[in-house]
């Protein structure tokens, strides 16, 4: 039984609203239907798929990063994304892949999770 696709990532947070706003503003993810769990949270959607689950109600001391280094999203609008990051005062690292030329932008969300956004090689800064 091979895996056929990545289904979702889950972010643990002590501030659900700030996390929803962050991913909505920078990645265009939108809250959508979520089962009636007994804990606070949200499911954030891209193209009608719940790709990011936000789980709240845990004090910061209980949050953990585990062994996952980062989550990556295929995106478009490199220049606009960099402008948003700069306007928010968020540090980022913008790199170009050798040979392929694809752009990678790394930054951290309000919970400390590392996010990568990937852009086509023909985009400009």
Roles of regions detected by a PLM:
Residues 1-17, 48, 68-71, 121-125:
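N-terminal beta-strand motif that seeds the catalytic metal site of vicinal oxygen chelate
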Residues 2, 87-125:
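Vicinal oxygen chelate
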Residues 5, 38, 67, 101:
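Exposed loop/turn and edge beta-strand positions of beta-sandwich/beta-sheet ligand-binding modules
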Residues 12-51:
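Core segments of cupin and vicinal oxygen chelate
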Residues 21-22, 84, 111:
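Structural preference for long, well-ordered alpha-helical segments within the folded cores
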Residues 52-55, 116-118:
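Conserved beta-strand in the GNAT
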Residues 64, 68-85:
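Mid-chain, well-packed structural core segment of small domains
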